[in-house]
Amino acid sequence: MARGGFPGMGGGMNINNLMKQAQKMQQQMQKVQGELEEKEFVASAGGGAVTVKANGKKEILSINIEPDVVDPDDVEMLQDLILAACNQALKTADEETANEMKKLTGGLNMPGMF
């Protein structure tokens, strides 16, 4: 094996440099993940009748319901609006997390990293 490298790689790939790059990427990923966990994502349903705020930890922070949408005879509609807004807020958080991590990893698929 070539000194400081791997066979067939021309000796240009130094394992120490590779490890340093991996550690740096891991630190950057942890930083971005922490920032995303604190970020708030807002989604609404029913033309703004129900608004949900979630964070990057996938915690629902608040649910706002416009009073005029509350109909005791149609609770199911309100439940559907709340569910739709919650799901959209969490989906938006997931998508942004995936996009930010993709930027860091250069598009490498790293399952379980975020």
From Swiss-Prot:
Keyword set includes Ribonucleoprotein: no
GO molecular function terms listed in the Swiss-Prot or TrEMBL record: DNA binding
Keywords per UniProt: Cytoplasm, DNA-binding
InterPro entries cross-referenced by the UniProt entry: YbaB-like_sf, YbaB/EbfC
Subcellular localization: Cytoplasm, Nucleoid
Quaternary structure, from the entry: Homodimer.
Domain of life: Bacteria
UniProt KW Iron keyword: no
Source organism of this protein record: Clostridium novyi (strain NT)
GO cellular component, one term: cytosol
Function of the molecule: Binds to DNA and alters its conformation. May be involved in regulation of gene expression, nucleoid organization and DNA protection.
HAMAP family named in the record: DNA_YbaB_EbfC
Identification of the protein by name: Nucleoid-associated protein NT01CX_0824
Family: Belongs to the YbaB/EbfC family.
